[in-house]
Amino acid sequence: MPNTPHTMNLYIKNIAQLVTCQGSEAKHGREAMGQIHTIEGPAAVVIRDGIIAFAGRMADVAPSMTEGCRELDATGRCVLPGFVDSHTHLVFGGYREDEFQWRLAGDSYMSIMERGGGIASTMRATRSESEDELKASARRHLSNMMKMGVTTVEAKSGYGMNLETELKQLRVVRDLQDEQPLDLYSTFMGAHDTAPEYKGRPTEFIEYLCREVLPEVVRQNLAECCDIFTEKGVFDHEQTRRMLTAAKEAGLSVKMHADEIVPFGGAELAAELGCLSADHLLRISDAGIKALAESNTVATLLPCTAFSLRADYAPARKMIDAGCAVALGSDLNPGSCFSASVPLMFALATLYMGMTVEEAITALTINGAAAIGRADTIGSIEPGKKGDLVVLQYPSYKFLSYHFGMNLVEHTVKGGRVVYTNS
């Protein structure tokens, strides 16, 4: 979406409470994650050419700093960094509302698969839909996320599991980057499951991805990262190592879906391979927690998925106390979690996962940024970083968990532009 210099210059004044989350790397453990660095008002933020030029006490703003800026009065309001959703399956075809009803009726995952549901259903729909159809659906989700204060979104492929459709999904992400305000981080996840053409032959499928799909993804510059579903019955450690090593050699960062269904040593492998993040972690072992705590790999937890599946939540409190850097993501997808609700993430993290509201804020800002390798440019409010902010309807960040389930966003600011206002 085109910007002019003027629209990217913004002076936010009279802020009741400014939450900066300052830092340029992931925050590990209870003490660091609990420090969100607030400035009580009146505070101000000045954004010039889309970049934060000042964040602090309003009395310290030099008049020359605000020349040519649009003014936004934040009297009685709290301002935070824009939220980073670091785990989504944004681009997909079709929906699985019938499958959700089957789950409510008690059907098992295997019985749903036998009825034609599960990931195979989404794969068939994604393969058949046009890029325009996929784009329209993804754009709608991004619009809803923007209204909840999200300013950066990670978006995976993985519902094609063949060359044509994986590239199609990633082209949709690329095109949407130019057609709407939010920043997108593109992840190639051809190894979401074994394609039906390779049923029972996961190692051969990984070789196909490494030999034919990954090189084309890289040649067309369609992804920054590569992800894989490492799980018993899906892809094992050897297959994961092969896929992610090939991706790293091709210049991509790497991530893993790990320890979601059973303890499988995924967290330990993610730390060993230098993954940006290990995600899900509902069944992480004590050894896995220790490995992540001693590494730079972010533990990205997805509470809405556990909620939707009526499963136990990831042990966030235990992980934070052990020294892990925890991020939160939505896991938006048409099957296990058809939601990207920021209010629900805050509620579940604080009420059911043992996190403080400060830790949840850290997890959705600077640690979310670290989970996609962008903590040096987003995730906090400080000079030199992108002007990505959320203005709440209330004077304190504590309302994010206290007034649970409600969208409290008054304005979303992306690169100095007000891209959403609650009217």
UniProtKB/Swiss-Prot annotation:
Any one biological process term the GO annotation gives: L-histidine catabolic process to glutamate and formate
Binding site for Zn(2+): H87, H89, H257, D331
Keywords assigned: Cytoplasm, Histidine metabolism, Hydrolase, Iron, Metal-binding, Zinc
One Gene Ontology cellular component annotation held by this UniProt entry: cytoplasm
Family from the record: Belongs to the metallo-dependent hydrolases superfamily. HutI family.
PANTHER family, per database record: IMIDAZOLONEPROPIONASE, IMIDAZOLONEPROPIONASE-RELATED
Protein name according to UniProt: Imidazolonepropionase
